[in-house]
């Protein structure tokens, strides 16, 4: 279950960031409309992926996903935009991952 949870979060994050990036390129950098259309379709996939999570609460899934998204966004900025994260970016991302673990795996009655 843990591996599926992680893979779904990673897939959703890449879909959200990748789709948003294509829309960004279309609107901000004058790329062809196909970029925007592809980005919109990928963003639809992003909306569907979290429904496959086994956790029953929408809010809990999206709150935990938010932490994963932050880490992926820092990595995207580093690898795609070539903007090297500083120490505080990494510390913040690590804190977010701790939050994800608390939200998803804390014992509940």
UniProtKB/Swiss-Prot annotation:
Highest taxon of source: Bacteria
Q: How does it sit in the membrane?
A: Multi-pass membrane protein
Pfam families, from UniProt? UPF0060 (PF02694)
What does the UniProt entry say about where the protein is found? Cell membrane
- Tell me which positions the record assigns to the signal sequence: none
A GO CC annotation given for this chain: plasma membrane
Regarding protein family, the annotation reads: Belongs to the UPF0060 family.
Name of the protein described by the UniProt record: UPF0060 membrane protein YfjF
Name the gene. Answer: yfjF
